[in-house]
């Protein structure tokens, strides 16, 4: 049986509106589990998630890294 890995998590908050943003940026927000202002989402800290956060520095901020 596989042992469960306790991975690190990162919490992001949406601080910008997706209105008048390209469809790719809207899709990235949805991929992060965000869709409305000031909502927070806790995700596994992976390179893919970090890349999505890096693409949207004007729309999201990292609240907590655990």
From Swiss-Prot:
Cellular component GO terms, alphabetical: cytosolic large ribosomal subunit
Superkingdom assignment: Bacteria
Keywords: Ribonucleoprotein, Ribosomal protein
Coiled-coil intervals, chain numbering: none
Residues spanning the membrane: none
Any single biological process term in GO: translation
A Pfam family of this chain: Ribosomal_L30
Any one GO molecular-function label of the UniProt entry: structural constituent of ribosome
Family to which this protein belongs: Belongs to the universal ribosomal protein uL30 family.
Complexes and interactors: Part of the 50S ribosomal subunit.
Protein name: Large ribosomal subunit protein uL30
Organism field: Brucella anthropi (strain ATCC 49188 / DSM 6882 / CCUG 24695 / JCM 21032 / LMG 3331 / NBRC 15819 / NCTC 12168 / Alc 37) (Ochrobactrum anthropi)
Gene: rpmD
């Amino acid at each position: 049986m596989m042992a469960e890995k306790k991975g690190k998590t990162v919490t992001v908050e949406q601080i910008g509106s997706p209105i008048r943003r390209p469809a790719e940026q809207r899709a990235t927000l949805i991929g992060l589990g965000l869709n409305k202002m000031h909502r927070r989402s806790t995700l596994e800290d992976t390179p893919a998630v970090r890349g999505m956060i890096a693409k949207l520095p004007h729309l999201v901020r990292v609240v907590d890294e655990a």
